[in-house]
Amino acid sequence: LIGAAMYANQVLGRSGMEEEAVKRNTKQYLAPMKAQATPRGVYDLYPAFPVGENKIRSGIGCLADWIERHGQVVIDGYGGVFWDELVSELGDEFRRRGKCVRWFRTDVAMRDARTLEEMLAPDLGGEDPLFGRMTERQLRDWFDPGKLNAFRPDQEADINVLIGIGAALAGWKAPLIYVDVPKNEIQFRMRVGWVKNLGMNKPKNNQQTYKHFFFVDWVVLNRHKAECLPQIELIVDEQRRGQQLLMMSGEDLREGLHRMGRNFFRVRPWFEPGAWGGQWMKQHIPGLNEEVPNLAWSFELMVLENGLMFESNGYRLEVSFDFLMYNDYRQVLGESADVFKTD
């Protein structure tokens, strides 16, 4: 997988769709905010599970409305989210409304990169390109407890926002928003250096970054996600930003996952070139970008890196497959649930 990802990076260079090239290195199209139902018998690139009418909302203004109604919120989420852009877009929206907002960023409470590197060295296996050890660490280990617990809402501000990875660990008694991003988009962002490993100051090469994701970052972030799931009041799909940001209530998310776990469903596939790639998929699957030199990978059963789409009024909101396992793994696995659990 790492080798295939590296090959794809070499083939694709630093290009992509013109408007996306700066921050994602791929020629795969960004999943659409809205999509029409696929005709019967045609391969569906964006399979989605229906959650009912008017369940999914869109736009940075809608997110700002939700935050303004509550006054004090915690915004946690996954590694790979463009946190600076999210703060900037929300900040612009609140300034237009004349609101005084106090922002608290969790990254300032993280331990320094050298300390984290020493802590994680046993899990990462040095310079070996493939082998490491699944970490037993928890996300809390990345933070200085004194700094994390020092965040206090400003009583003079109209709105207080604690935002960033691990925000829920600070113990604020406030509604929790969780911002998710698909793992394929994380990797596309990684290839242009926009995504670094958790707590690191600078990016590694792509192969070592992915290895670090696999053995460390995604392990601890998934554990934290599982702990957050019952408390999430709003889930945000961040792969598109600005007016194409999508969100749904935590209650509708959990109900959708609950129903999905008792039904048939498909993950959203994604595609990449590779050393053994050919032209068959481009010729037989409508909607794929035909500018790629070949297609070798159809990531559809690789659920570690796949997402699940929910549909309402044509909107397609995506969350990672992990959410389904944390919510309903017994329904998904049946009699094998006690053996494999959420893994």
Show the residue positions of the predicted features.
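Structural motif
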Residues: 75-80, 163-166, 239
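Extended, regular secondary-structure scaffolds
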Residues: 182, 188-192, 199-221
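Glycine-rich phosphate-binding P-loop
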Residues: 74-90
